[in-house]
């Protein structure tokens, strides 16, 4: 068995790994770089079978549905088998309805897998392991072929609401690993970095801010970061507030198929449809979706009566509405709960201007979706693979400080396992 990291040895995101054995090939992840320009097709790696169907390419395996791992999927040949977690598929299909450039994932050759249930892709035996990450339904993979055992960590952490999963992983039969690809997004950060800040910490900090606020609270977070939605919801419950989100978030929550999560019909959850989304619903005739999620629907009139009762999961599409409802901005608070780098990008220019104009302070409360150095060291020590290859990192040389088994690879280099 041989592997090639087409992209990921010198950057965070854009992962694409190819395995080859017995004349068959398997691709793991197909993401766009974090600094990608608008013409995404240019980032598709030069791999036989991606554009034109090739029987030698047995399939594409997806660890999770963040864009830096799946963003190039719309450019593959639709006949090529594509494998991802069943909840990931459901979320992806729901989310795609709202994308500016809509892509119909139903046209692809989609296949599902489930946690710890082994399956075959060509000669490769795949065992997926559910991991704690900021994307719902994220996996690492044990891949066996030719008597070799290869482990791909995917993106992971132990600071989320599924932190137990890393201990469960250690209890699996994952000794005698010939080669491990392990992420190193935050390998260079020290222990004071927010990589050690947990989702429970996020919840507690939000409770403090919610209780101090005398008005409406805006929280900017990803609707697909289900752990974060839960943290916000729990903070709402503990500060006597309601969580308010839009139809997009309602459909994402529905797609998890998990009634334990804050769904649109849950107590203390309300639905608010911003103007831009109302136009989308009308133009696309999404009336069934709207009806399905409208049992707790509220309007501006409801928020105006008791703004201190609500926490709004805020997105850019809300700007038009709140520019016309200036009175609701009095005593309001804005909590930013994403990676700090996004806030300085052009996409956030209108939000920055909105906050500045209305003198609304930005408060950052966030927890990383990635393993810190101590966890990376723990995984390497517990699993003790013969060869360790860093990926999804800008600091691969640091791994040499952790183990003498580290091999620092370059993009497009073929490596024998």
Walk through the language-model features, giving the residues of each.
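Short acidic-hydrophobic, aromatic-tinged amphipathic segments that line or gate anion-handling sites
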Residues: 109-115, 271-275, 407-409
